[in-house]
């Protein structure tokens, strides 16, 4: 008999099916046994009256929580069963794998008259045994929602003539100004782990691909210990040609994110609200836009927050956080585009206007930066000069060549998929990454 997923088995009332999964909960008494079986689609109660099934007693007595079993039996309606009013009466139970006592506590266990409360293990302890922690409803929901979000964005772009590409992660020169890189030995020379696919996205524009996107790993050798930073994360990057302004890039991004959030809300909005207490809000467009200087002025008026003159060319961490309260109050929105940063704080390849102002933006969602986007400088002479100003011309010589033989005006942005997931579900980056990598974390 072929396996049936639990969500389909629940519909097969009166039928006999085979289900497989982990034992989430087990109650084994003298006369009855109740097993909550879980697979990636749902949960099903297995009810055993031992008097009717003496052949199953020895097998049931061997079972432990988180063991993996195969159960074949009849699906029945039972209004007293909480899981959809459905249970299975087993004909056979086969043990696939017996689990030892778990080394971590995944959820806090409340105190009873007979037992003390048991605290949940710390996030670092749970990451030590990440594969066990990932079995929880919350963790699996996060990655289902993440998959839905990414697939919706991919579909959005494919429907608009974008091509998906995959660029090298071993590169000859750092791709971002201001970001630390991981240096690796590459035979007789140095190479670096890519901080972004930026150079190669733009190469695709010079190649006439016009519209491209990529999902892939991003590496940042930054010793940051916040709840939103990681040394390796999954990026979602795109670039497209024949734009007239960085505002075209902003419009593309807000439409892309709206499509992604709509898909997540439709498929998982209720579950996210139930398990995380987070409302999935599909934003209205266009998103609010504010110049950096005007935001600082607004934050001073609203919250008394001030920064030194030397800091006003970039967004401080505290201003980033306060911007959420500010945009909610003034626009009733969760997203905020911030423009007009200092050229000193932006990458050399950002186009600048006649006043030297970079033609780009940051996008803030729920008080956290999720994107830097811009129109790129595609004119070789101007780009070379801007690279020289940053002291990078020799290091990026191969990149500058992309623009010597014709290149259309273009722009783009990059998103952190894990950070999107983190904000969507109200968790930390350690929760939102499948396997977190940070300054002190390289295993499992």
Positions of predicted regions on the chain:
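Flexible helix-coil linker/hinge segments at domain or subdomain boundaries
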Residues: 259-273
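Short, highly charged C-terminal tails/helix-capping segments
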Residues: 271-285
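A translation/RNA-centric and nucleic-acid-associated enzymatic feature enriched
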Residues: 180-262, 285-444
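Juxtamembrane/interface motifs at transmembrane-helix termini
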Residues: 108-109, 269-271, 419
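Polar, glycine-rich mid-to-C-terminal structural blocks
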Residues: 134-137, 266, 299
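Class II aminoacyl-tRNA synthetase-like tRNA-binding/catalytic domains
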Residues: 2-243, 435
């Amino acid at each position: 008999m072929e396996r049936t997923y639990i969500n389909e088995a629940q519909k097969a009332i009166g039928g006999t099916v085979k289900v497989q999964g982990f034992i989430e909960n087990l109650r084994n008494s003298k006369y009855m046994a109740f097993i909550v079986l879980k697979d990636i689609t749902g949960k099903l109660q297995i009810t055993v009256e031992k008097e009717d099934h003496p052949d199953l007693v020895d097998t049931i007595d061997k079972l432990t929580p988180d063991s993996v079993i195969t159960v074949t039996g009849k699906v029945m309606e039972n209004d007293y069963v909480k899981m959809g009013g459905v249970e299975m009466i087993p004909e056979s139970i086969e043990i696939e794998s017996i689990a030892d006592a778990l080394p971590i506590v995944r959820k806090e266990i409340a105190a009873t008259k007979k037992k003390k409360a048991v605290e949940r293990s710390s996030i670092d302890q749970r990451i030590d045994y990440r594969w066990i922690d990932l079995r929880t409803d919350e963790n699996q929901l996060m990655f289902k929602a993440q998959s839905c979000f990414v697939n919706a964005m991919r579909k959005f772009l494919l429907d608009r003539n974008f091509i998906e590409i995959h660029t090298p992660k071993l590169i000859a020169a750092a791709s971002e100004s201001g970001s630390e890189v991981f240096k690796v030995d590459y035979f007789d020379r140095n190479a670096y782990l890519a901080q972004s696919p930026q150079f190669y996205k733009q190469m695709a524009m010079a190649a006439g691909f016009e519209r491209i996107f990529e999902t892939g790993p991003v590496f940042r050798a930054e010793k940051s210990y916040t709840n939103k930073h990681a040394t390796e994360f999954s990026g979602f990057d795109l670039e497209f040609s024949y734009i007239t302004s960085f505002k075209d890039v902003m419009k593309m991004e807000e439409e892309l994110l709206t499509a992604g959030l709509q898909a997540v809300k439709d498929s998982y909005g209720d579950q996210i609200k139930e398990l995380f207490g987070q409302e999935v809000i599909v934003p209205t467009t266009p998103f609010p836009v504010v110049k950096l200087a005007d935001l600082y002025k607004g934050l001073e008026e609203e919250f008394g927050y001030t920064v030194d003159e030397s800091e006003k060319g970039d967004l401080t961490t505290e201003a980033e956080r306060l911007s959420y309260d500010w945009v909610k109050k003034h626009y009733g929105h969760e997203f905020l585009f911030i423009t007009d940063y200092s050229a000193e704080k932006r990458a050399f390849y950002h186009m600048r206007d006649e006043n030297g102002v970079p033609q780009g933006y940051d996008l803030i969602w729920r008080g956290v930066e999720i994107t830097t986007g811009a129109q790129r400088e595609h004119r070789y002479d101007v780009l070379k000069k801007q690279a020289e100003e940053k002291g990078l011309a020799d290091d990026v010589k191969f990149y500058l060549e992309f623009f010597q033989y014709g290149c259309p005006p273009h722009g783009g942005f990059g998103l952190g998929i894990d950070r999107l997931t983190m904000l969507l579900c109200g968790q930390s980056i350690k929760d939102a990454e499948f396997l977190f990598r940070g300054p002190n974390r390289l295993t499992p």
